[in-house]
């Protein structure tokens, strides 16, 4: 009997969120889960070659092996480079607000 893993894949945009429950074969990777979820097809803005993935909020490589009940998260790309935003604020003489 082949072992199976129950995992979830999560992705969120400002207008919609996905949480897809999957059953995958033992030894499946984070990338396997992302591909099997169907989210990449539903969200053309995601670049398969540059996916940023995580498991329970911690960065994970695409080839990271999954365990039972893991939640794979697909992260959106940053809209702005944090260093560049900080530099622009410094040039404008603005202080960053504490806490965000």
UniProtKB/Swiss-Prot annotation:
NCBIfam families: PRK01777.1 (NF002490). PANTHER family: UPF0125 PROTEIN RATB. It holds the Pfam family Ub-RnfH. It comes from Chromobacterium violaceum (strain ATCC 12472 / DSM 30191 / JCM 1249 / CCUG 213 / NBRC 12614 / NCIMB 9131 / NCTC 9757 / MK). Belongs to the UPF0125 (RnfH) family. This is UPF0125 protein CV_3462.
